[in-house]
Amino acid sequence: MDSNTVSSFQDILLRMSKMQLGSSSEDLNGMITQFESLKLYRDSLGEAVMRMGDLHSLQNRNGKWREQLGLKFEEIRWLIEEVRHRLKTTENSFEQITFMQALQLLFEVEQEIRTFSFQLI
């Protein structure tokens, strides 16, 4: 995994956790949780690709990994829409920068997961 991506995840999660968005803080916590989950999933998929012989093990361990992959893409699309919405509604420049970087990171992670999954197929 690219060390820049790791630091990007950590930076964005840290900054999102410091935001105070009033009544929507529960929604923001949900987004943070999904970001963390997405990072873990991407990391595990990347590790499986690094050990190409692990494909058989991955398929045995999780017979529904393609279904899970589809759900992750839905989750990414939902997060992208949520981040876009927040970006449009906030006037705070710190939040705008954070959400713009989060959006860029989501696009990068989506591409990485697609690349990993094609290598596993």
From Swiss-Prot:
- Keywords in alphabetical order: Host nucleus, Host-virus interaction, Transport, Virion
Q: Which Pfam families match?
A: Flu_NS2
Q: Which is a GO BP term held by this UniProt record?
A: exit of virus from host cell nucleus through nuclear pore
Which range is the signal sequence, renumbered to this chain? Answer: none
Location relative to the cell: Virion; Host nucleus
Q: Source organism's superkingdom?
A: Viruses
Q: Which GO terms describe its cellular component?
A: host cell nucleus; virion component
Q: What stretch or stretches form a coiled coil here?
A: none
Please give the SUPFAM superfamilies that the UniProt record associates with this protein. Nonstructural protein ns2, Nep, M1-binding domain
Instruction: Show where the record puts the motif Nuclear export signal.
Output: 12-21, 85-94
Concerning InterPro entries, the annotation shows:
Flu_NS2
Return the similarity comment: Belongs to the influenza viruses NEP family.
The task this protein performs is described as: Mediates the nuclear export of encapsidated genomic RNAs (ribonucleoproteins, RNPs). Acts as an adapter between viral RNPs complexes and the nuclear export machinery of the cell. Possesses no intrinsic RNA-binding activity, but includes a C-terminal M1-binding domain. This domain is believed to allow recognition of RNPs bound to the protein M1.
- Record's subunit section: Interacts with protein M1. May interact with host nucleoporin RAB/HRB and exportin XPO1/CRM1.
Task: Provide the protein name.
Answer: Nuclear export protein
Name of the encoding gene: NS
